[in-house]
From Swiss-Prot:
Coiled-coil stretches: none
Entry binding sites for N(1)-(5-phospho-beta-D-ribosyl)glycinamide: 18-19, 78, 283, 353, 360-361
Binding-site positions, Mg(2+): 264, 276
Main EC class the enzyme belongs to: ligase
GO cellular component: cytosol
Organism of origin: Synechocystis sp. (strain ATCC 27184 / PCC 6803 / Kazusa)
HAMAP family listed in its UniProt record: PurT
Keyword Magnesium in annotation: yes
MF (Gene Ontology): ATP binding; magnesium ion binding; phosphoribosylglycinamide formyltransferase 2 activity; phosphoribosylglycinamide formyltransferase activity
Keywords: ATP-binding, Ligase, Magnesium, Metal-binding, Nucleotide-binding, Purine biosynthesis
Annotated ranges, domain ATP-grasp: 115-305
Identification of the protein by name: Formate-dependent phosphoribosylglycinamide formyltransferase
Length: 391
């Protein structure tokens, strides 16, 4: 794209969760129109978009119909469970997919992005193999060795992941992976367990023109394969940061297009090891809602539209901590907000999800402080004060 586009533009958002909601808000602040699409009604982004559509995004015909109905300027995937082969067809027919249809197709499945990174680009990753049945998983686990990590090739927010310590845990890991998979895949990836010091996300911004940009690295902690807290900046050495940026640029250049990419790494004293990549805003990047002059959603929007990004300024140590449901419920309410909001240097975002299940992420607490450790403690304190009530 040679020049910035003329506004307003129309975005078809495929996936309408909390990340899509923040992107929609960013888009609307510049007067754009958003059609929010998801498989269930009243999803978070639908509550702020001009138009909502409920379809199965794994149904290629339904996906094509909604695209042709609205004729969007941009198709912006926000989740994994999309019939990405249809996006390739739509792009070939003249529709613009962010970052590209091919990038979306590759990264929606862990096997494809892993093959690109490890085999084609020569990037250091954990040793890995695949399984499509319990019997295969038992065999592959023995070959990789214990402990190892089992993940569905297609899932979101770490769902279905397990650390397998011995052969007796393989069957449980298979069941968890299949239950946590998105889409219609029954394939898992088995990785060697990396004894890392730190997991980070490096938010990487590709522009249609101009250099690739990076946010300060974001550290994060996971439980049940899902993000629980994140903080910025993560304490990397100059050597580690340079290695991470070089790898992120190599992989995102191979994918092409424009927008923000969440590139995940394991950090050890000796190595920077590529883990995963999402071609869109990243859940751990919600800390940027308080930590940067331009948050990840605004950066994604500017990159898509070819608008200038003169400076990405990290405004001080910051952290996020998730607010989770403890049990299932169809009617939600929240207590403790008055107590939570008394803390200086903090904020709370409740996503507006219509129902709950155990450990579902319903909101996030944000905090800034004099140090990363203090910000992490403060964000956790605020998150714990918000009580999710279900009926």
């Amino acid at each position: 794209m040679a020049n910035p586009v003329t506004l307003p533009q129309t975005f078809l958002l495929l996936g309408s969760g909390e990340l899509g909601k923040e992107f929609t808000i960013a888009a609307q602040r510049l007067g754009n129109r958003v059609i929010a699409v998801d498989r269930y009604p009243d999803a978070p982004a639908m509550q702020v978009a001009q138009v909502a559509e409920v379809i199965s995004m794994l149904d290629g015909n339904a996906l094509e119909a909604v695209v042709k109905k609205y004729q969007p300027d941009w198709i912006v995937p926000e989740v994994e469970a999309i019939r990405t082969e249809k996006l390739l067809e739509l792009e070939a027919g003249g529709y613009r997919v962010i970052p590209t249809a091919q990038a979306t197709n590759l990264t929606m499945n862990r096997d494809r992005i892993r093959e690109l990174a490890a085999q084609q680009l020569g990037v250091r990753t954990a040793r890995y193999n695949y399984a499509t049945s319990l019997a295969e998983l038992e065999e592959v686990s023995q070959a990789i060795g214990f402990p190892n990590v089992v993940k569905p090739v297609m899932s979101s927010s770490g769902k279905g992941q397990s650390v397998v310590n011995n052969a007796g845990e393989v069957q449980q890991a298979w069941s968890a992976a299949i239950a946590g998979a998105r889409g219609d895949q029954t394939k898992v990836i088995v990785e060697e367990f990396i004894p890392f010091e730190l997991e980070i996300t490096l938010l990487t911004i590709r522009q249609w023109q101009g250099e690739t940009l990076f946010c300060d690295p974001i550290g994060h902690r996971q439980e049940r394969g899902d993000y629980q807290e994140s903080w910025q900046p993560a304490p990397l050495t100059q050597r580690q940061l340079a290695q991470a940026q070089a790898i992120a640029k190599t992989v995102t250049d191979a994918l092409g297009g424009a927008g923000i990419f969440g590139v995940e790494f394991f950090i050890t004293p000796e190595e920077v090891i590529f883990s995963e990549l999402s071609p869109r805003p990243h859940d751990t990047g919600m800390v940027t809602l308080i930590s940067q002059n331009l948050n990840e959603f605004e950066l994604h929007l500017r990159a898509i539209l070819g608008l200038p990004i003169p400076q990405i300024k990290q405004t001080g140590p910051a952290a996020s901590a998730v607010i989770l449901a403890l049990e299932a419920g169809e009617k939600l309410s929240y207590a403790g907000l008055a107590e939570a909001l008394t803390e200086s240097g903090t904020d709370v975002r409740l996503f507006g999800k219509p129902n709950a299940r155990p450990h579902r992420r319903l909101g996030v607490a944000l905090a800034q402080a004099e140090s990363v450790d203090a910000a992490r403690r403060l964000a956790q304190t605020v998150a714990e004060k918000v009580i999710v009530q279900t009926e």
